[in-house]
């Protein structure tokens, strides 16, 4: 697992990157004392539905949203970024809410 530290003027935080990281999800949440009310799971449609269910079962929050998309070079564009931003805005995501991205090419 790779930990990428992010340092800003207002807050420092970490981005966790790695294989099978979902098995460490609850450990990371407790270790970092992360509190969030909403989660957005951005998933490549090639990811199995059972794996998506497994991930959602690990996430404990008030509102869970899953956004599926086709992993294709055509879809790596501002339209998809705007779609994701619209989901965040329409659901009143805050800075302390969770975004999880899974799959190749996201």
What residues fall within each predicted segment?
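A phosphate-binding catalytic loop at a beta-strand-loop-alpha-helix junction
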Residues: 98-106
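ATP/NTP phosphate-donor binding region
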Residues: 1-99
């Amino acid at each position: 697992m790779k930990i990428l530290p992010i340092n800003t003027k207002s807050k420092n935080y970490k981005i966790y990157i790695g294989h099978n990281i979902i098995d460490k999800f609850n450990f990371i949440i407790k270790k970092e004392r992360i509190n969030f009310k909403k989660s957005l799971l951005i998933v490549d449609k090639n990811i199995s539905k059972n794996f998506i269910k497994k991930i959602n079962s690990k996430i404990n929050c008030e509102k869970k949203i899953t956004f599926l998309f086709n992993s294709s070079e055509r879809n790596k564009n501002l339209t998809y970024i705007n779609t994701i931003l619209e989901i965040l805005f329409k659901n009143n995501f805050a800075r302390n809410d969770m975004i999880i991205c899974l799959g190749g090419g996201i």
